[in-house]
From Swiss-Prot:
GO biological process: L-histidine biosynthetic process
Gene from which this protein is expressed: hisB
Protein name: Imidazoleglycerol-phosphate dehydratase
Reaction(s) this enzyme catalyzes, per UniProt: D-erythro-1-(imidazol-4-yl)glycerol 3-phosphate = 3-(imidazol-4-yl)-2-oxopropyl phosphate + H2O
Family named by the database record: Belongs to the imidazoleglycerol-phosphate dehydratase family.
Pathway in which the depicted protein is active: Amino-acid biosynthesis; L-histidine biosynthesis; L-histidine from 5-phospho-alpha-D-ribose 1-diphosphate: step 6/9
């Protein structure tokens, strides 16, 4: 099974995460930030990955450190669970609509961290959640999972719908990219021979 656990403890957060890339979409989430847990659940359900997150963060300041550090820890766990990357499809994309909103996520499990994030949220907050933190989560994940990620919200009027389509599309693209290709068993999906 492709799974991993990561603990990350700093002066700002104490985090324990676990991920199973070949799961059934089950999640156990306690970041202390309700909307963020709702978004992480989208990754698990649409990515068919089992994800567990337990976090105690400095929420008396704001949610920035919590969201960013969960992204870092999940990225580390994802990378460990993926292992040597042999046999995976590597590239994937997904479009996801939710009513008026439509987002596209394209990714490459390349070994090269890179984030292109083109989202203009229609408001600054979703409830108490600062929409700037969506990008912070993905930057943390990308840096530590070592993947190239393009996120584009193509349209949307409701900020909740914009965010939800992004996280759903991310989960679906991850699921497709980590899928084992029966024609690539034991083969590195790169002409370089490594990722």
């Amino acid at each position: 099974m492709r799974n991993a656990e990561v603990s990350r403890n700093t002066l700002e957060t104490k985090i324990a995460v676990a991920i199973n890339l070949d799961g059934t979409g089950v999640s156990k989430l306690n970041s202390g930030v309700g909307f963020f847990d709702h978004m992480l659940d989208q990754i698990a359900r649409h990515g068919m990955m089992d994800i567990s997150v337990e976090c105690q963060g400095d929420l008396h300041i704001d949610a920035h450190h919590t969201v960013e550090d969960v992204g870092i820890a999940l990225g580390q766990a994802f990378s460990r669970a993926l292992g040597d990357k042999k046999g995976i499809r590597r590239y994937a994309h997904a479009y996801v609509p939710l009513d008026e909103a439509l987002s596209r996520v394209v990714l490459d499990i390349s070994g090269r961290p890179g984030l292109e994030f083109n989202v203009e949220f229609t408001r600054a907050r979703i409830g108490e959640f600062d929409v700037d933190l969506v990008r912070e989560f993905f930057q943390g994940f990308v840096n530590h999972a070592a993947l190239t990620l393009h996120v584009d919200n193509l349209r949307g009027k409701n900020a909740h719908h914009q965010a939800e389509t992004i996280f759903k599309a991310f989960g679906r693209a991850l699921r497709a990219a980590v899928e084992l290709d029966p024609r690539m068993v034991g083969i590195m999906p790169s002409t370089k021979g490594s990722l």
